[in-house]
Structures are given as structure tokens and as C-alpha cells.
Amino acid sequence: MEKTITIGEREFKFKSSAATNILYKRAFKEDILVKLTEYTKYLKELKQLGAAFKELKNSEEKTEEEINIELTALMNSDAYVKTQNFSSDTLPKLAYIMFLEANENIKTIFTKLNEDYYLEWLMTVDQDELLTVTGEVMDIWQAGTKSHSKPKN
């Protein structure tokens, strides 16, 4: 799947293909599918923690100080930290791979599968604005994964 996303005032074209996962692994020495599985697990935990915190916040028995202690514990939880790391580290890397696929020829892609080119690209994008579109990047990647994972009859 291919889509253009506006980041700040610039438009960026992103593409997900059957090669996206392999290119990601080559560039960053990590398996994006493993990262996504971990993220999903931590996201579920975070939702449970959030629901527990909401109950705590609505409780009339707890003091404001106790609520703040619980909120701090939630924000320091492994689930919160891991989901934040996925959003701020893994998704921009995935966006970079999908940017290469949409904008570079095949031979050029292979020369740019490294941290240096990733950092160079990252310097051209506003970090906060990139983080606001990571959901769209995930949607493109998942749509590309689905379109390449259909069983053949």
C-alpha cells in the first residue's frame, strides 16, 4: 500500500510492501514483527493499568497524594515505558523504511539501509510532528502486510 502523509508542512510518500519487514530487519537488526507483538502485549497491560487508575482517581477514599503516587507508578511501569519507546523509536524507523520504499529505486534502498542514513532522514523531519502521524504509518504498514499475506488458492 502507498499513501502520502503530511508531516508539518511537507508531504511524504510512504509505501509498505512484502519486503518492508525484511528491509527493517536488515537496517536495524531487529524483527519488526517481534517488536509489534511486544507492543501489543504492553498496550493491553497499559489499558488495564489505565482502567485501574481511572477507578482510583474516581475513588473518594484516596487522597490526592495517593493518586499522584499511583499515577507516577503507572508512568514508570514497564508497559508505559515500552509503549512509549515503540512509538518514539520503532515507528519512526518503520516510517523511514517505508519512505525509502516509496521514494528510492531498489538499488538506492540497499545503500541507505543503515543508521547513518536513518539519522540523516530524521533530521529533515520534525520529531513531534512525526510522532503525531505514527498511527497512519502503522495503518499503511498493516494494510501492506494484509495485502501480501493473503493465502493463494
Give the positions of each predicted feature.
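Charged interaction scaffolds used for protein-protein
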Residues: 1-14, 19-21, 41-44, 54, ...
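Subset-of-secretome marker
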Residues: 47-51
